[in-house]
């Protein structure tokens, strides 16, 4: 049995499969995941699991060199925006319009849907390298 880290087998597989510059999107309940995308749906109920906790768990195992968010998060969801800024204080944070974000996210290797129910709680994690 695995001792630590991500116990969800699909997410563990997603992280282990990431190469340099691959993208993994963590999104809220209402996000329109592309029809043919590979994703895991973690939603149990509204808010469970939440956006920030999901990011923190993925970061436990994934090396990230850059993140992309919708600029609208700063105005419409200041609480999560500030948490994202704190979590990624040493990593490039690229802001795009929500429409641009959705276009970029279509290229994500994987999606993780959370139970988050606050506006613009979506992020693209761009995989880095550990050397």
From Swiss-Prot:
Segments crossing the lipid bilayer: none
Disulfide feature: none
Catalytic center residues: 20
Pfam family, one: RbsD_FucU
Role: Catalyzes the interconversion of beta-pyran and beta-furan forms of D-ribose.
Assembly and binders: Homodecamer.
The entry's keywords: Carbohydrate metabolism, Cytoplasm, Isomerase
EC number: 5.4.99.62
Keyword Isomerase: yes
SUPFAM superfamilies: RbsD-like
Any one annotated GO CC term: cytosol
Top-level taxon: Bacteria
Pathway: Carbohydrate metabolism; D-ribose degradation; D-ribose 5-phosphate from beta-D-ribopyranose: step 1/2
Similarity field: Belongs to the RbsD / FucU family. RbsD subfamily.
Subcellular location as annotated: Cytoplasm
Protein name in the entry: D-ribose pyranase
InterPro entries the UniProt entry points to: D-ribose_pyranase, RbsD-like_sf, RbsD_FucU
PANTHER family: D-RIBOSE PYRANASE
Catalytic activity: beta-D-ribopyranose = beta-D-ribofuranose
Residues annotated to bind substrate: 28, 98, 120-122
GO molecular function annotation: D-ribose pyranase activity; intramolecular lyase activity; monosaccharide binding
GO annotation (BP), single: D-ribose catabolic process
Coiled coil: none
């Amino acid at each position: 049995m695995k001792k630590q880290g991500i116990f969800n087998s699909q997410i563990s597989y997603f992280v282990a499969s990431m190469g340099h510059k691959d993208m993994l999107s963590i999104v809220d309940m209402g996000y329109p995941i592309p029809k043919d995308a590979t994703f895991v749906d973690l939603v149990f109920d509204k808010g469970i699991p939440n956006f920030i906790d999901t990011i923190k768990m993925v970061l436990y195992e994934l090396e990230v060199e850059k993140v992309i968010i919708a600029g609208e998060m700063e105005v419409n969801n200041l609480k999560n925006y500030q948490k994202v800024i704190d979590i990624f204080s040493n990593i490039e944070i690229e802001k795009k319009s929500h429409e641009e974000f959705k276009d970029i996210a279509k290229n994500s290797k994987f999606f993780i849907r959370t139970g988050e129910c606050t506006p613009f709680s979506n992020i693209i994690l761009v995989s880095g390298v550990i050397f």
